[in-house]
Amino acid sequence: MNIYFAGPMFAKADLLYNEYLVKKIRDLDDSINVYLPQENGAINDKRAYADSKMIALADTERVLESNLLVAVLDGITIDAGVASEIGVAYAKNIPMIGLYTDTRQQGADNQKKLAALGDTAENQFHYLNLYTVGLVKLNGSVVSDEQAFLDLIKETLNK
């Protein structure tokens, strides 16, 4: 199974988290082939040169070759590249699993947090772009923890 891993990849923390998750995915089964864009030095060695068309063509080709796209949705906003990859996968009906671990999504039953929504600039919850999330959900699902993420990947593998 070919899996495309979409995630932010410009901060050291992002790179390390991506490596951590991809190792866990690869350890699920020997038949899994994960494409992690940050491992593609031809376009993602930031000391070298790759123009926008080179990057778009290389990553789009790998999205289109995938049987599953998995995406890290965490961040101030969903990473622009991740959103683009999700759009390509949606258009080609490629199944998707989104991972959204932001702790601000917790407390949906806390009445004080809910009441604060009526006070300007007091949103206690994190916002994700609903269009992008909708594309993921139309072709799959979004989960909030790593184990559920890995379980869904394994479930998809066994279909």
Segments predicted by a language model, with ranges:
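Conserved catalytic or regulatory cores that recognize and/or transform ribose-phosphate-containing ligands
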Residues: 1-159
